[in-house]
Regions:
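Short amphipathic alpha-helix that is part of the acyltransferase structural core
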Residues: 1-42
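A short helix-loop-beta-strand connector motif used in the catalytic cores of GNAT acetyltransferases and
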Residues: 43-59, 80
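GNAT/GCN5-related N-acetyltransferase fold signature
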Residues: 57-58, 70-74, 86
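Glycine-rich phosphate/pyrophosphate-binding loop shared by adenosine-nucleotide-utilizing enzymes
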Residues: 62-69, 79
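Conserved acetyl-CoA binding element of GNAT-fold acetyltransferases
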Residues: 77-88
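Conserved acetyl-CoA-binding loop-helix of GNAT-fold acetyltransferases
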Residues: 86, 92-106
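Conserved GNAT acetyl-CoA-binding A-motif
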Residues: 107-119
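Extended, composition-driven regions rather than compact fold-specific motifs
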Residues: 123-124
């Protein structure tokens, strides 16, 4: 499994392609969170402009074969895991744990905030 950190300075063509892939990968979240797609687009705009957004991708066969993702917000006021998702077929293989560990390291916070949909509270 490969892990890629996407941050400020990403090539705009690569960012557009990753946004497209993540919209597909996270499509079901649009049913759980109002305006999720618009939020994801905003994250990518912020990603190209500031250091406050980071994305960690877990990939199998190259950067576009996404198996898991963690979307982070890191500001002086907030260190937060906004989204953490592993594709169902790749769950229970340690990918989520690895994404969580890498998120904690990048956020430099042992107890970051994390957004969890009410539907998924029992999983945590």
């Amino acid at each position: 499994m490969e892990y890629h950190i996407i941050k400020k300075g990403i090539d705009s063509v690569l960012a557009d392609n990753l946004l497209f892939k993540l919209k597909l990968f996270l499509a079901d979240l649009a049913f759980e969170y109002p305006f999720f797609t618009e939020w994801l687009e905003k994250v990518f705009k912020e990603l190209t402009l500031t250091d406050s957004r980071l994305i960690i991708l877990s990939c199998d066969n190259g950067i576009f074969d996404i198996k898991g993702v963690s979307i982070l917000k890191k500001t002086s006021d907030e260190k937060k895991i906004c989204t953490l998702r592993v594709v169902k077929s790749s769950r229970n293989q340690g990918i989520g744990s690895c994404l969580l560990q890498k998120s904690v390291e990048l956020l430099e916070e042992n107890k970051p905030l994390i957004t969890v949909s009410g539907i998924h509270m029992k999983e945590f």
